[in-house]
A protein has these predicted regions:
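Metal-ion/cofactor- or nucleotide/acyl-coenzyme-handling active-site neighborhoods
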Residues: 1-140
Length: 140
C-alpha cells in the first residue's frame, strides 16, 4: 500500500505475529486478547453465518457493520462462508485452554457445532451480557 510509504516510521510501532498468521481481523483481535493474558474474554460480533433470509435454503445475507463501505461487500450480498473464521477461533480456544471464552450473541442465534467440543467456551445472550456489566442498551 502506497500510503505506508508516506510515513514509514508508523510501522515501527506495529507488533507483528511471528510467524504471520494471515488471519481475518476478528480472530486476530481474539488472538491478541488471548496473548494479553486475560482470564475471561467476551467475544462479540462472531455470528459466523450472517442473517438467514430463507430458513429452507439457509441462505444468508452479509451481517457486518462495515457492509456498504469502501472496499467491502454490500449489505445485500450473500454472507461470506465462515469456515476460515471458525478454524481461526478454534485455534485460539485450543491454544489458550486456561482462558474462559464467552460468545455473546442474540437469543436463538446460530451456535456452530464446531465450537461445542470445547469446555472453555460458553454462550451468553446479549441481554445477559448487558445485565452482567450493567450496561445501557440503546433501542434498535
Amino acid at each position: 500500500n502506497a500510503q505506508y510509504n508516506k510515513n514509514p516510521t508508523i510501522l515501527n510501532h506495529v507488533q507483528w505475529f511471528q510467524p504471520s498468521l494471515g488471519w481475518s481481523s476478528g480472530p486476530t483481535a481474539l488472538r491478541m486478547a488471548c496473548e494479553k493474558g486475560f482470564k475471561h474474554i467476551y467475544i462479540l460480533g462472531f455470528d459466523y453465518q450472517g442473517h438467514v433470509v430463507n430458513p429452507n435454503t439457509k441462505a444468508a445475507k452479509l451481517n457486518n457493520i462495515f457492509g456498504d463501505t469502501r472496499n467491502y461487500k454490500k449489505r445485500t450480498d450473500e454472507a461470506t462462508f465462515y469456515g476460515n473464521w471458525m478454524n481461526q477461533t478454534k485455534r485460539c480456544l485450543a491454544d489458550f485452554k486456561e482462558i474462559k471464552f464467552y460468545r455473546v450473541c442474540p437469543e436463538g442465534a446460530f451456535k456452530p457445532k464446531d465450537l461445542e467440543w470445547n469446555e472453555n467456551l460458553g454462550h451468553m445472550n446479549t441481554k445477559e451480557f448487558v445485565e452482567l456489566f450493567k450496561l445501557t442498551q440503546r433501542p434498535t
